């Protein structure tokens, strides 16, 4: 998509136009670094009016911003499906994302993140619609195409396929527990035809290319190589990095080397905790699962809910 957008522009001198900082690698991922934080040295060639490579970069940044707008619209309409009689909750949900510093940073950069975020939001909106409305072949096929495009934009899109398959399995419970073998069979062929097949058609060629070229269908081994190779970290060493991952959810800029003031992380972490408390209160309080024509507590159906919910947990 990005290549098609900037195809009319002359970017043949991109390597010469972009002046990389030869000492920039010293600041990558190091928030304590006081110098060499910029990976690119900025010159007057970037000044207005933009031309060539720099015009292409700004067009791609604008494209990322438009994808962010699409994501916000998707969040709003998803919330409207959940709370059709309320306008404040959808606006609040949209505002929480719109004012998230990391969201604004990602959607002002040239990256594949804005596209997969947009497609993931579109897929979640479709799943909510399928939960509330009839499960039709057209809707399932559209969901499969959306997930396929997400998987093509980034490997994390594959997780959407697992999530959607588990979600649709639980959706079958909503229609009742009678004749569950037939329901399971229906879920199986619908998932294969309308979800898995479009994903394979859209993203399968890339996975095959990665397998032939790298011996890894996800090409993850190449990212490991670029990061310095497998350092054989233990599980606890990996978990020790979770604080950095948590901060990156809210505000980590530059090349993972620019942090926001401490109060920013406290504020957004507090909002996340309040949200989790609200979810727990809802689950143990007044939550009921609509099964068939009845509204019942899900506790009575734990033996059926647990195996059907396993794909969601995975």
Protein language model features and the residues they cover:
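Interfacial juxtamembrane loops and adjacent helix segments
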Residues: 1-63, 228-230, 255, 259
């Amino acid at each position: 998509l990005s290549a098609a957008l900037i195809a009319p522009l002359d970017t043949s001198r991109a390597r010469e136009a972009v002046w990389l900082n030869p000492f920039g690698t010293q600041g990558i991922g190091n928030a304590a670094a006081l110098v060499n934080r910029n990976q690119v040295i900025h010159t007057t060639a970037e000044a207005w009016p933009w031309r060539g490579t720099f015009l292409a970069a700004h067009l791609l940044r604008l494209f990322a911003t438009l994808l962010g707008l699409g994501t916000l619209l998707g969040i709003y309409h998803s919330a409207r499906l959940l709370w059709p009689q309320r306008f404040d909750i959808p606006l609040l949900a949209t505002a929480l994302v719109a004012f998230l510093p990391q969201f604004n940073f990602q959607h002002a950069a040239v990256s594949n993140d804005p596209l997969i975020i947009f497609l993931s939001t579109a897929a979640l909106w479709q799943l909510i619609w399928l939960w509330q409305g009839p499960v039709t072949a057209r809707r399932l096929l559209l969901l499969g195409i959306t997930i396929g495009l997400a998987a093509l934009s980034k490997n994390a899109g594959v997780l959407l396929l697992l999530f959607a398959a588990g979600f649709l399995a639980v959706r079958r419970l909503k229609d009742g527990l009678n004749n569950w073998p037939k329901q399971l069979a229906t879920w199986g062929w619908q998932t294969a035809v309308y979800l898995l097949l479009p994903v394979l058609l859209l993203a399968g060629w890339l996975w095959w290319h990665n397998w032939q070229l790298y011996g890894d269908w996800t090409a993850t081994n190449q990212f490991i190589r670029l990061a310095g190779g497998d350092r054989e970290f233990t599980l606890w060493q990996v978990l020790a990095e979770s604080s950095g991952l948590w901060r990156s959810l809210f505000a980590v800029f530059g090349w993972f080397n620019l942090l926001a003031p401490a109060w920013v992380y406290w504020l957004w972490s507090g909002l996340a905790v309040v949200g989790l408390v609200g979810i727990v209160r809802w689950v143990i309080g007044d939550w009921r699962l609509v099964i068939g024509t009845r509204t019942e507590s899900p506790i009575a159906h734990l033996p059926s809910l647990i195996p059907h919910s396993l794909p969601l947990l995975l």
